[in-house]
Swiss-Prot record:
Residues 1-34 form a transit peptide. SUPFAM superfamilies: IlvD/EDD N-terminal domain-like (SSF143975), LeuD/IlvD-like (SSF52016). Its EC number is 4.2.1.9. This is Dihydroxy-acid dehydratase, chloroplastic. It is an enzyme of class 4 (lyase).
Length: 608
């Protein structure tokens, strides 16, 4: 079977049954034929009890004792013939209150159409989501990271209870992507992720805006560099339509990494949300999933140590979010593999930072689409010898086979640097240890901040007190190491992101004049001299909970150390006097999270 994968830079449409004709502003998809036949498996093996396509759903559709199950399925419209078809669970993270997710219901309709055209039965169901941008800077952000595990739990629950044979998930926002892949890893049934796509940038009076522009406008306002009217103008033009936040923030980081890992179709991570090609991808997903069922090719065949390394290479080369560390560790654990902080450091030492993308750079994901998309970037990384091309993907072919006929990056493009002129010779994600982070921490160092910072601690119990202080006197932060603690997985709870504090610092013009440390996380939109994921967290008695105002803290990226000048004797005295703070919640979903969540260095998983 030959199916079509598409590129935005080409002259011909593929066959009409797969991609109906439409106007895509001269970016017409090229025909890249990728056989879904495995190099080792017969593409059409005889159906037996072990390899029949509906081997899961037949548990409820075939036994006469399951009459109740069959009655319900007839009630929702299935015929007797339909009961013999594979049933595909189509899980959408649709909800109206977020630009990242508001269009996913429409995409799920196209996925269902493709599933049915492939001769299968598609059943759509929804899972929950949290808008990080809406909840950022409030206690609502405590619910963000745990939504990843709720997404995984809910997809696993429905897929298992309903006996679906395969899964196509349609995520949009940051935690959606790892949540859907974690569910696929746990289930280990054929699955494909269809990314909802990136938003286009906003424009007003020759200026370009995105969501981070909106966050940084507050710091610019409190520092007096813009008026309140100018601030509101930024807000009105930062999010001009559907799609995930447009820079190499967490959503686009994870979508690119998952494509590099092989769990989404080529171009999935770079086709913008509102481009007609996104609907074409949705319709193609069913055809590819049918082939995965025939081959019995499952997530644990695709997510391997080598493909996880490919994902890490993508994160480093593109300047991706530090959240990828948490999420890739959690994805690895969902398939029974161990990924450690040291694995990230090894990749960071070997892979240069090449992409001039926001938040630290100039361009956005839509610009990657215009120069050939993620496959062109992956082909470049493969040609440099940075990726393993032998890894299997959801096309039924290896990564190298998928990329063999992909057009190279557009000649003259300036987004992806040549190896001879990287933004940074090694990766921007650095794993730091020391007496302040004995179990590790994650720094995001793009090279623009410098590689060394030392200064007195300015300690805050939570981000809200820090925001009040910088609003009152921004210049008091100059030269300090800002410490925001009590924001870890258990202490936050939920390890909230510190985008509002970092944006306030950057907006106030202090990006090179102070550092920020936290046992919480950073948004993919955060930049500056920032170190997060400090372990152990303050709630668990970590050294970050013992720091006092004025203590000298030194961050040395070259030595990969984060230390304080407080003597061991003094730290021991402080530890003896320390008592664990009371949990901030004692009921509900966050309390369950506190009781189950592992440390940041273990991916904040909740099912171990």
């Amino acid at each position: 079977m030959q199916a079509t994968i598409f590129s935005p830079r080409a002259t011909l449409f593929p066959c009409k049954p797969l991609l109906p004709s439409h106007n895509v502003n001269s970016r017409r998809p090229s025909i890249i034929s990728c056989s879904a036949q495995s190099v080792t498996a017969d593409p059409s093996p005889p159906i037996t009890d072990t390899n029949k396509l509906n081997k899961y759903s037949s548990r409820i559709t075939e036994p006469k004792s399951q009459g109740g199950s069959q009655a319900i399925l007839h009630g929702v419209g299935l015929s007797d013939d339909d009961l013999l078809k594979p049933q595909i669970g189509i899980s959408s993270v649709w909800y109206e209150g977020n630009t990242c997710n508001m269009h996913l219901l429409k995409l799920s309709e196209a996925v269902k159409e493709g599933v049915e055209n492939a001769g299968m039965v598609g059943f759509r169901f929804n899972t929950i989501g949290v808008s990080d941008a809406i909840s950022m800077g409030t206690r609502g952000m405590c619910f963000s990271l745990q939504s990843r595990d709720l997404i995984a739990d809910s997809i696993e629950t429905v897929m298992s209870a309903q006996w679906y044979d395969g899964n196509i998930s349609i995520p949009g926002c940051d935690k959606n992507m790892p949540g859907t892949i974690m569910a696929m890893g746990r289930l280990n049934r054929p699955g494909i992720m269809v990314y909802g796509g990136t938003i286009k940038p906003g424009h007003f009076q020759d200026k370009t805006y995105d969501i981070v522009s909106a966050f940084q406008s507050y710091g610019e306002f409190v520092s007096g560099s813009i008026s309140d009217e100018q601030r509101k103008t930024v807000l009105h033009h930062s999010c001009p339509g559907a799609g995930a936040c447009g820079g190499m923030y967490t959503a686009n980081t994870m979508a690119s990494a998952i494509e590099a890992m092989g769990m989404s179709l080529p171009y999935s991570s770079s086709i913008p949300a509102e481009d007609p090609l996104k609907l074409d991808e949705c319709r193609l997903a069913g055809k590819y999933l049918l082939e995965l069922l025939k081959m019995d090719l499952k997530p644990r065949d695709i997510i391997t140590p080598k493909s996880l390394r490919n994902a890490m290479v993508s994160v480093m080369a593109l300047g991706g979010s530090t959240n990828a560390v948490l999420h890739l560790i959690a994805i690895a654990r969902s398939v029974g593999l161990e990924l450690t902080l040291d694995d990230f450091q090894k990749v960071s030492d070997a892979v240069p930072f090449l992409a001039d993308l926001k938040p630290s750079g100039k361009y956005v994901m839509e610009d990657i689409h215009k120069i050939g998309g993620t496959p062109a970037v992956l082909r470049y990384l493969l040609e440099l010898g940075l990726m393993d091309g032998d890894c299997m993907t959801v096309t039924g072919q290896t990564l190298a086979q998928n990329l063999e006929n992909v057009p190279s990056l557009t000649e003259g493009q300036e987004i992806i640097r040549p190896l001879s002129n990287p933004i940074k010779e090694t990766g921007h994600i650095q794993i730091l240890r020391g007496d302040l982070a004995p179990d590790g921490s994650v720094a995001k160092i793009t090279g623009k901040e410098g590689l060394y910072f030392s200064g007195p601690a300015l300690v805050f119990e939570g981000e809200e007190s820090m925001l009040a202080a910088i609003s009152a006197d921004p210049m008091s932060f100059k030269g300090t190491v800002v410490v925001i603690r009590g924001e870890g997985p258990k202490g936050g709870p939920g390890m909230p992101e510190m985008l509002t504090p970092t944006s306030a610092i950057m907006g106030a013009g202090l990006g090179k004049e102070c550092a920020l440390l936290t046992d919480g996380r950073f948004s993919g939109g955060s930049h500056g001299f920032v170190v997060g994921h400090i372990c152990p967290e303050a709630q668990e008695g970590g050294p970050i909970g013992l720091i006092k105002n004025g203590d000298i803290i030194t961050i040395d990226i070259g030595k990969k150390r984060i230390d304080t000048q407080v003597s061991p004797e003094e730290m021991n005295d402080r530890r003896k006097k320390w008592t664990a703070p009371a949990y901030k919640v004692n009921r509900g979903v966050l309390y369950k999270y506190i009781k189950n969540v592992q440390s940041a260095s273990d991916g904040c998983v909740t099912d171990e």
